[in-house]
């Protein structure tokens, strides 16, 4: 997957290229990341990249000319098939379904705003989609962009090594993940569930699915609104709720 990022702080993206899953993906040639800094497209000696908003008010906006030129440079490098994404609180909220959709694109250009944002005409003429990572305020689009990159890259074939790792992540099937355990078998009086030590793969699968359903029921019940449970899932969830009521 090819990724271009428009940012005033390209150094921040070393967290993507140098570390963890995404760092290995870059090293192995599965992920290619390039940055364009609007400061490199300025024409004054101060490398000015902000400007005052029409109508007054607090704060500044990113200057149009350097930002637009940076986007054009990224588009020229990416090719016509690239999709331009602006990280914005006004965008569609990123969830696993959205991540899956974005992962179908082989080339993405991510525009990271700063200050109070960017000129609306840039969004109208240069941006294909707006995405948000949540209903809260951040200082810029870099952290949302890194969040999007990390989530999308996990779905690129070969990045995780085993596709099962991605398939078992929280939200991959619309549910929260089940609990996980490692050694020792007993920790401060808390034991690993016996079923996980049984070696019975079918029973382990059912336990994990039931725990995933139960955890979603307890913590994020609204997720069920978008799910059509199978007969097996419905039965397991009913059993979980019944057992919970008995132990209440």
Swiss-Prot record:
Catalytic reaction(s) noted: guanosine(37) in tRNA + S-adenosyl-L-methionine = N(1)-methylguanosine(37) in tRNA + S-adenosyl-L-homocysteine + H(+)
Residues binding S-adenosyl-L-methionine: 113, 133-138
Subcellular location as annotated: Cytoplasm
GO (cellular component) term, any one: cytosol
Methyltransferase is among the record's keywords: yes
EC number(s) stated in the UniProt entry for this protein: 2.1.1.228
Keyword annotations from UniProtKB, A to Z: Cytoplasm, Methyltransferase, S-adenosyl-L-methionine, Transferase, tRNA processing
Molecular function terms from GO: tRNA (guanine(37)-N1)-methyltransferase activity
Gene3D superfamilies (alphabetical): 3.40.1280.10, tRNA(m1g37)methyltransferase, domain 2
Primary subcellular site in the record, as a coarse category: cytoplasm
Biological function: Specifically methylates guanosine-37 in various tRNAs.
Quaternary structure (record): Homodimer.
Name listed for the protein in its UniProt record: tRNA (guanine-N(1)-)-methyltransferase
């Amino acid at each position: 997957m090819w990724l271009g990022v428009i940012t005033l702080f390209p150094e921040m993206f070393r967290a993507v290229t140098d570390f963890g899953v995404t760092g290995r993906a870059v090293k192995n040639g599965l992920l290619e990341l390039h940055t364009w800094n609007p400061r490199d497209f300025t024409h004054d000696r101060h490398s000015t990249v902000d400007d005052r908003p029409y109508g007054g008010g607090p704060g500044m906006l990113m200057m149009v000319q350097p930002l637009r030129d940076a986007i054009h440079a990224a588009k020229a490098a990416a090719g016509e098939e690239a999709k331009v994404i602006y990280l914005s609180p006004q965008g569609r909220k990123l969830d696993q379904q959205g991540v899956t959709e974005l992962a179908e694109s082989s080339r993405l250009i991510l525009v990271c705003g700063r200050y109070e944002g960017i000129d609306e005409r840039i969004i109208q003429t240069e941006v294909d989609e707006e995405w948000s990572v949540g209903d809260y305020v951040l200082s810029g689009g870099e952290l949302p962009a890194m969040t999007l990159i990390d989530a999308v890259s996990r779905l690129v074939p070969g990045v995780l090594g085993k596709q099962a790792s991605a398939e078992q992540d929280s939200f991959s099937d619309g549910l929260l993940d089940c609990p996980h355990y490692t050694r020792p078998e007993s920790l401060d009086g808390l034991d690993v569930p016996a079923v996980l030590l049984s070696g019975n793969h079918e029973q382990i699968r059912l336990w994990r699915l039931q725990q995933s359903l139960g955890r979603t029921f307890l913590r994020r019940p609204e997720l069920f609104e978008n799910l059509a449970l199978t007969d097996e899932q419905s039965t397991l969830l009913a059993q979980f709720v019944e057992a919970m009521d008995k132990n209440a």
